[in-house]
Amino acid sequence: DLNGEVSSGGRVCWRSTAINLSRSRTAAGAEPSMVPQPDSEGEWTSEKPIPAPEDTGRAFARVTGDVNPIHMHALSARLFGFPRAIAHGWWTTGRSLAVLGVDESLPGRRLEIAFRRPVELPSTPFLCSRVGADGEISFGLFPAAPAPSGADPVRALVAGVVSG
């Protein structure tokens, strides 16, 4: 685990725990433990395309300074075993939260993200979400538009829960 904390004026304003490069085998039919488990029930209500053009990784690097060959170009990504360049995980998270409209309301809330499989570039994954009675937002980024009943976070490229 990688733990981080940011303080301002002696007050903690951000805290995170990142579990990186974690792989495990599960028994047949068992859910992987790294997938956020939403408490909310109900139908997945939104299905929105999230265009990820071929230059997404380069644009993200220009803004953040996070230059990584797997995000820059298909040629450099192949050197690391990827068939194409892949979107940065924080790009997929940030873009999903912006489309859901929760990017401005995150302070004081909990965000759990599981990066299940890479978002290859270019592609247009689909964002599905549902909101529980308690205001918890569950979302998944899927490689193709699933039927509402098929929006299972275990099948998502990226799965997340915003709560609190």
Indicate residue ranges for each PLM-predicted region.
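Hydrophobic beta-strand-centered segment that forms part of the acyl-chain substrate-binding groove
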Residues: 1, 81-82, 91-131, 136
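Catalytic strand-loop segment that frames the active site of acyl-thioester-processing enzymes
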Residues: 18-87, 101
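Small-side-chain structural scaffolding
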Residues: 4, 16, 57, 61-64, ...
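HotDog/MaoC-like acyl-thioester-processing domains
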Residues: 1-49, 118-121, 126-164
